[in-house]
C-alpha cells in the first residue's frame, strides 16, 4: 500500500521539481542589466560589500542580474582611513577584485561626506590642514583603483533641503571651495573616471534642493570645475516614483555629460514606483544607469519598509518582474 502513495506523491511533485531549473534559467535570462543595456543604457547595478557577497544568494543574483556594483560601506572614510594616514583597503579591495573577476562595472562611493567620518577629521579646525587631508584621502583612494572604477561619488550630500550648502566640517573650515578642490583633486588622480556630485531628495522638480543643485552645478561647471554627473540617490517613499519623471530631466539640464540613479529603494517596493524610475532614466538620454541599494529586503538599511527587488528568500518581487516587462517593451 505504501508504494502507490509514494508513486502518486512523486507524480504530483514531478512538475514542480522539473519547473525549478527552468524558472532559474528564465530569471537568469531576464537580467535587468542585459535588458537595460539593450535599451541603450550602460548598466543596472546594485550596492553590496564583502559581507553580502559571501552570504545567501547575493553573489549569484548579482552575477546573473546586475552589471555594476557600488560598495555600500567599504570605501567610506571611516572604513578606509580610520586614523590619519593609516589606510585599510581590505573591504574595498575585496569588492573591486570580485567585480573585476565577474565583469562588473564599479562605482566608487564616497570620497567627501560629512557622515561616517572619523572624529580625527571632523575635529580639524585649520583650513590648510583639512584641505591637505581631504586631497590626500581622495588621491590615495583614486590612485589605488585608477582605471578600475567607472565613476566616483566625489562629494556626497552637500546640500540642505532648502538648497543651501550643508554645514559640515569641510564647508565650515575650508569654505565653499572645498567642492571645486575635491573635484579638481579627483580629476588629477584618475582623469578617466566620471566624477559625480551625489545627493538625496532630488525626486521632485519643484523641490528647492533639486533646483539648487542644478543651478550650482551649472555655476561650478562654467567655472571649470570637472563635474561629470549628478547622482540622484532616489530613496523614495511610496508614491514618489512619478516625481522622478520630471525631476531627472531637470537634473540633466545642468549640462553634465551624465546623470544616474545611484541608491534606489522604494518603501513598499511598488511596481509602479519602480517602473516610473526606470522610465525616467530611459527617457533622459544622459542617464547612464540605475543602481538599487541592496539585493534583498532584510539587508536594506530600511529593511522594515521592504524596499528592494528581492525578498528575504532571495525571490524576485513583483517590482522586479514589472521592471523586466517594462524593459522588454
Curated annotation (Swiss-Prot):
- State a single Gene Ontology molecular function: endo-1,4-beta-xylanase activity
Q: What is its EC number?
A: 3.2.1.8
Q: List the disulfide bonds.
A: 281-287
Report the superkingdom from the record. Answer: Eukaryota
Q: Which residues carry this modification: Pyrrolidone carboxylic acid?
A: 27
Q: Which residues form the active site?
A: 157, 263
For the protein in the UniProt heading, the enzyme class is: hydrolase
Keywords, alphabetical:
Carbohydrate metabolism, Disulfide bond, Glycosidase, Hydrolase, Polysaccharide degradation, Pyrrolidone carboxylic acid, Signal, Xylan degradation
What is this enzyme's catalytic activity, as reactions? Endohydrolysis of (1->4)-beta-D-xylosidic linkages in xylans
- Spell out the Pfam families in the cross-references: Glyco_hydro_10
User: What GO biological process terms does the UniProt entry carry, in alphabetical order?
Assistant: xylan catabolic process
**Which family does this protein fall into?**
Belongs to the glycosyl hydrolase 10 (cellulase F) family.
The protein's name in its UniProt record: Endo-1,4-beta-xylanase
Protein's organism? Thermoascus aurantiacus
Q: Show the taxonomic lineage.
A: Eukaryota, Fungi, Dikarya, Ascomycota, Pezizomycotina
Amino acid at each position: 500500500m505504501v508504494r502507490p502513495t509514494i508513486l502518486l506523491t512523486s507524480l504530483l511533485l514531478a512538475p514542480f521539481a522539473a519547473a525549478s531549473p527552468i524558472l532559474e534559467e528564465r530569471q537568469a535570462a531576464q537580467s535587468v542589466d542585459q535588458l537595460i543595456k539593450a535599451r541603450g543604457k550602460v548598466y543596472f547595478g546594485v550596492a553590496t560589500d564583502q559581507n553580502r557577497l559571501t552570504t545567501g544568494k547575493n553573489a549569484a543574483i548579482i552575477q546573473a542580474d546586475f552589471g555594476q556594483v557600488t560598495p555600500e560601506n567599504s570605501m567610506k572614510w571611516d572604513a578606509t582611513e580610520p586614523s590619519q594616514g593609516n589606510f585599510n583597503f581590505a573591504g574595498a579591495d575585496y569588492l573591486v577584485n570580485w567585480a573585476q573577476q565577474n565583469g562588473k562595472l564599479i562605482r566608487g562611493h564616497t570620497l567627501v561626506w560629512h557622515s561616517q567620518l572619523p572624529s580625527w577629521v571632523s575635529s580639524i579646525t585649520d583650513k590648510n590642514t583639512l584641505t591637505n587631508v581631504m586631497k590626500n584621502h581622495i588621491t590615495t583612494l583614486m590612485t589605488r583603483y585608477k582605471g578600475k572604477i567607472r565613476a566616483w561619488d566625489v562629494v556626497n550630500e552637500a546640500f540642505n533641503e532648502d538648497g543651501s550648502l550643508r554645514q559640515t566640517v569641510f564647508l565650515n573650515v575650508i569654505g565653499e571651495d572645498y567642492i571645486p578642490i575635491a573635484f579638481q583633486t579627483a580629476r588629477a588622480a584618475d582623469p578617466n573616471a566620471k566624477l559625480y556630485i551625489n545627493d538625496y531628495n532630488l525626486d521632485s522638480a519643484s523641490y528647492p534642493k533639486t533646483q539648487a543643485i542644478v543651478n550650482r552645478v551649472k555655476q561650478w561647471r562654467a567655472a571649470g570645475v570637472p563635474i561629470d554627473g549628478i547622482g540622484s540617490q532616489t530613496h523614495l517613499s511610496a508614491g514618489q516614483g512619478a516625481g522622478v519623471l520630471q525631476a531627472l530631466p531637470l537634473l540633466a539640464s545642468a549640462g553634465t555629460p551624465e546623470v544616474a540613479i545611484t541608491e534606489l529603494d522604494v518603501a513598499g517596493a511598488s511596481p509602479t514606483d519602480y517602473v516610473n524610475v526606470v522610465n525616467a532614466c530611459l527617457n533622459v538620454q544622459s542617464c547612464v544607469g540605475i543602481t538599487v541599494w541592496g539585493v534583498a529586503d532584510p539587508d536594506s538599511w530600511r529593511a522594515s519598509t521592504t524596499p528592494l527587488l528581492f525578498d528575504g528568500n532571495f525571490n524576485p518581487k513583483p517590482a522586479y518582474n514589472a521592471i523586466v516587462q517594462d524593459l522588454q517593451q
